[in-house]
Amino acid sequence: DIYKLPRIWTGIPELDKVIGGLFFGQVTLLTGKRGEGKSTFMSQLMVEALDQGYAVFAYSGELSDYHFKRWLDFQAAGPDNIATNTNVYGDETYLITNPVIEKINAWYRGRAYIYDNGAMDMEDELEGLLETVENVVRRVGVKLVCIDNLMTAMDVGISDNLYQAQSAFVHKLKRLAVKHDVAVVLVAHPRKTKDSFTNDDVSGS
C-alpha cells in the first residue's frame, strides 16, 4: 500500500496531495526557469525534513558552503526570527541575530551536512561528490540528499557526450537512492530558454 510507505512530506499540502511527498529510494527532479525559486524550494524541503526528524545533505555548485548555509538559515529561522536593518545606502536588509543563529546551529548539529565544493579539484568532483554522499548516508544516516544542480555537479563540457553523461550521473544517483533507501532531490535547468518546456527539455531527464 503506497499510502503506508514512509516518506518526507514537503510541507505544502497541495503538492503532497499530488505527489504524495518525497519517497525513499527515489530521485525527484526539480526544474523550472532561472530565478523561479528552485534553490529556495530545495532549502525549504531540507528544513521540512529536519523538522520531521530526518538528517539531510546538500551540494550546491553555485554557492559556497557558507553562502548556502546562510540561505538555509533564513528558511529555518522563519519570518518571526528575521530582523531588518538599513545599510549605508538607505536600503533595507535582512539579518538573523546571533542568539537565533546559535539556536539554529544547535538544531542542525549532527543532522545537517553541506558539501564543501572547494575541497577537491574539478576533475575529481563528480566521483568525489558521489563518494561523499554514500559515506555520509552510511555513517550518519542521512535520509534526504539535495543536489543543486545537475550541470555544476558534473565536469563534462557542452558536447555530444553531455546528455549521456547526465543520464549516467542520474542513474548512479538512482542506484544510490535504492541501495540506501534515501530520498534524492536533483535540481536541473531546462536545456532551452522559452515560455514552456517538456520533459525532453530538462537536462538529465
Give residue spans per PLM region.
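Conserved inter-motif catalytic segment of the P-loop NTP-binding fold
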Residues: 54-159
